[in-house]
Amino acid sequence: MSAMKITFLIAVAGHLLCGVCDCLLTYMPGGRFHFEDMKDNGRLSAVFKGMPLRNSLLSMLLGCLAMFLFAFGYLALAHWMRAFSETCAVLMLIGTVMVLTFGVAHHVFCGMPEWLYVKMGRTEEARQLITEFFTKTSVTLIVCYLGFLIFGVSLFVPVVSGWTPLPRWACVFNILPLMLVLMPTRVGGSGNWAGAIMFLGLLLLF
């Protein structure tokens, strides 16, 4: 098995693990968490009732490990692209760095408020605190997904244009269109399931 395929396998494992971590922050004993629940403490408290504190801690810690793992796949693709488009390769590298730096912060900033909310007894004061915290740190989410956008477009254009040895239809194995398909389903961890599908598809094509 080539080194490229090994990095793709590691990336698949990383995205699957990160998807599980997302689900730990999304699906609670009281039901599915929606951001709209943060507007009403009655709804929010009902969702988080009975949630073990270890869930958010595991999500934060394993999420950092997961992003470390899937970094190998993105960096390998950026390096591979250099043979066909130096510009796209640089953009893919920039997008990857944006995802890894701001994405790790965002993952921790999602887990920490949930841990604090439960630790503080799911009170109205706790709800106000975590809402303010999440709002003021939401830039990490924006930059992370901007990085995915830059990476996805920079991979999509060369493949669909025929600049690479991959068949043009291989452009579907790209995190951007896969995320656009999965996100309307509102399933927890949709971005990571999209990433796992992308690397699994590319694993079969390389």
Language-model segments: what does each one mean?
Residues 1-206:
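Hydrophobic, aromatic-enriched alpha-helical segments typical of multi-pass transmembrane helices
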